């Protein structure tokens, strides 16, 4: 009989047991302080269709004011518990075979019955534990320990006293992306552990093709790592005081150390890492990097299409997406691909049934991405012998980029920090990496509020607070840059002011989300770059004599462009200012949602919710 938790506390750790009814464990996570108790029900282990199981797979950490049912449906992580047990049984049997050749690194193995890939070399006695004669390995307890932005994580305990992590992606960007990302993530973690000797979880098995694999869900089964997230110590808005620098560096230094390791290997192409059997035959002949002396590693990984999320955001079919995902021999080709992908997305959206307002906005976005497409091929000087950029060759070499480098994805284990998540990891030149997302800030740089902000001392506390936040975010970036300089001095040119401005249209396009108004960020960066183009060309930082769009040819045309951009930006800012929770696309943490609903501040409006007017 299976014990499940329902009416889940927001952001709580939910556990149910498979065996005798045992004590239900619920340990609240720090991120939200919920004290809502969990109710329990039971389900038969032999009945996959028992509706009692359903609540365990539902998304519970928040509610959307608009399209809540649709958003939550995308985040349902239903999987076959029976399939998990079948997978564990195969892993257990494989571990016994591995014991016979413990010193041999074997290639990943495709299991025809499970329709999944196993990594035999990671399966041993220590991993799987020991069973009594005639006993089968089974899951005895499951815990939902994390509901993230893009995936959900379950902890599985077994009757061998060993625990595992089951990681399931949400279906936010379509089946094809989930298949791509799970294959690339597994290979990237394997590469980091075996080639670079980094602390990452071992991958035991992974499966794409949710319709056919044993779990009936795209999944990764991996090592469970004990410890606290670095996020527990991360306070980006801590005020300057004795010990504040040390507090910030206690998080940023371990992350900078991880980044230094990620950058050690330079590759032969731009794209993403995969196991050899997961890429097309034509891509298997090329080595991912040069100089490998370990014969067991030589053909283990290959470079295939980029797994960066920007190419997959629209949930398009494979044949539509793969036109843009590489792999590429030249760095600038990836920049062009990002522009082409963004433009393609807008053009496909224009074919839908639209309101006049939607069509107008999309046509504006199309104009901007066409401008970016014109600039992309010459965004940087291709002849690095002419460029005034220090260490330009180093900055343009293919290096591993992990977008999820974040204190939320690093566990402080007794053995040291472990990087848990490499979703969307890709190979691109360091000059195009940008800041880690948790440090990103594009506003005014303030290094000292009293010196850089006129009249700061006479401002009200509320006004001062706005500038304080700008200062703190600038300070955090500066600490990160200092850490980069200490560890990778040859790459510090990537944070030069000119380089930041040149690459910003590209980074803005990479960051584009579901809101089509993101074109305004791309346009803003293009406008700023156009004004500095001649200066940057003099130093051979950019690749064309003149900024390659027509509105930059005359002062009148440029001013008209600026005015139109300003009007669009004001209209958009006015719109989102009147939309509650616009920064989270209408998502409200569940504890907060429950409180506001009880207070009558949030009220139901059909299938949506609205904020009640005073």
UniProtKB/Swiss-Prot annotation:
Record keyword Mitochondrion present: yes
UniProt keyword annotation of Mitochondrion present: yes
Residue interval of the organelle targeting sequence: 1-39
One Pfam family matching this protein: APH
Main localisation: mitochondrion
GO cellular component, one term: mitochondrion
Classification via SUPFAM superfamilies: Protein kinase-like (PK-like)
Subcellular location: Mitochondrion
Keywords: Mitochondrion, Transit peptide
Family: Belongs to the AIM9 family.
Annotated protein name in UniProt: Altered inheritance of mitochondria protein 9, mitochondrial
Organism: Komagataella phaffii (strain GS115 / ATCC 20864)
């Amino acid at each position: 009989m299976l014990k499940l938790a329902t009416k889940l506390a927001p952001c709580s750790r939910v556990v149910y047991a498979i065996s005798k009814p045992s004590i239900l464990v619920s340990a609240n996570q720090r991120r939200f302080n919920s004290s809502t108790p969990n109710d329990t029900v039971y389900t038969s282990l032999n009945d996959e269709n028992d509706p009692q199981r359903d609540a365990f797979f539902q998304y519970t950490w928040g509610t959307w004011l608009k399209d809540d049912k649709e958003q939550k449906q995308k985040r349902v992580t239903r999987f076959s518990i029976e399939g998990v047990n079948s997978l564990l049984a195969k892993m257990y049997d494989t571990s016994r075979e591995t014991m016979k050749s413990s010193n041999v690194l074997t290639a990943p193995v495709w299991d025809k019955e499970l329709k999944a890939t196993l990594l035999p070399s990671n399966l041993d006695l220590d991993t799987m534990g020991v069973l009594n004669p005639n006993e089968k390995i089974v899951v005895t307890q499951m815990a939902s320990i994390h509901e993230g932005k893009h995936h959900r994580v379950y902890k599985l305990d077994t009757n061998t006293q060993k625990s595992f992590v089951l990681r399931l992606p949400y279906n936010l960007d379509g089946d094809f992306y989930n298949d791509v990302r799970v294959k690339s993530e597994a290979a990237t973690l394997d590469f980091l552990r075996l080639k670079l000797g980094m602390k990452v979880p071992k991958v035991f098995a992974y499966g794409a093709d949710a319709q056919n694999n044993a779990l009936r869900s795209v999944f990764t089964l991996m090592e469970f790592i004990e410890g606290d997230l670095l996020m527990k110590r991360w306070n980006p808005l801590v005020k300057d005081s004795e010990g504040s620098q040390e507090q910030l560096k206690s998080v940023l230094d371990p992350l900078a150390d991880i980044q230094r390791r990620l950058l050690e290997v330079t590759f032969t192409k731009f794209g993403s890492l995969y196991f050899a059997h997961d890429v097309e035959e034509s891509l298997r002949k090329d080595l991912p990097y040069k100089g490998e002396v370990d014969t067991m590693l030589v053909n283990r990984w290959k470079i295939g299409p980029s797994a960066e999320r920007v190419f997959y955001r629209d949930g398009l079919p494979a044949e539509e997406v793969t036109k843009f995902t590489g792999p590429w021999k030249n760095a600038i080709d990836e920049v062009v691909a990002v522009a082409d992908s963004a433009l393609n997305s807008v053009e496909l959206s224009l074919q839908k049934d639209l309101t006049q307002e939607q069509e107008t906005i999309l046509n504006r976005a199309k104009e901007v991405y066409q401008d970016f497409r014109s600039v992309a091929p010459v965004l940087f000087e291709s002849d690095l012998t002419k460029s005034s950029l220090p260490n330009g060759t180093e900055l343009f070499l293919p290096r591993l980029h992990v977008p999820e480098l974040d204190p939320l994805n690093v566990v402080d284990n007794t053995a040291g920090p472990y990087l848990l998540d490499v979703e969307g990891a890709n190979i691109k030149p360091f000059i195009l990496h940008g800041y880690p997302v948790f440090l990103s800030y594009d506003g005014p740089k303030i290094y000292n509020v009293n010196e850089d902000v006129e009249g700061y001392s006479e401002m009200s506390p509320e006004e001062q607070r706005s500038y304080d936040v700008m200062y703190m975010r600038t300070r955090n970036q500066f600490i990160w840059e200092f850490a980069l300089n200490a560890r990778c001095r040859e790459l510090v040119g990537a944070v030069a002011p000119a380089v930041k401005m040149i690459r910003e249209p590209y980074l803005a396009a990479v960051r584009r989300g579901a809101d089509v108004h993101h074109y305004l960020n791309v346009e803003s960066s293009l406008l700023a770059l156009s004004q500095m183009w001649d200066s940057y060309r003099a130093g051979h930082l950019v690749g064309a004599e003149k900024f390659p769009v027509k509105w930059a040819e005359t002062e009148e045309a440029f001013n008209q462009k600026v005015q139109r951009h300003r009007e669009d930006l004001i209209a958009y800012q006015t719109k989102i200012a009147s939309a509650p929770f616009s920064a989270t696309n209408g998502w409200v943490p569940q504890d907060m949602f429950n409180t506001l609903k009880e207070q009558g501040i949030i009220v139901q409006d059909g299938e949506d919710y609205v904020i009640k007017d005073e």
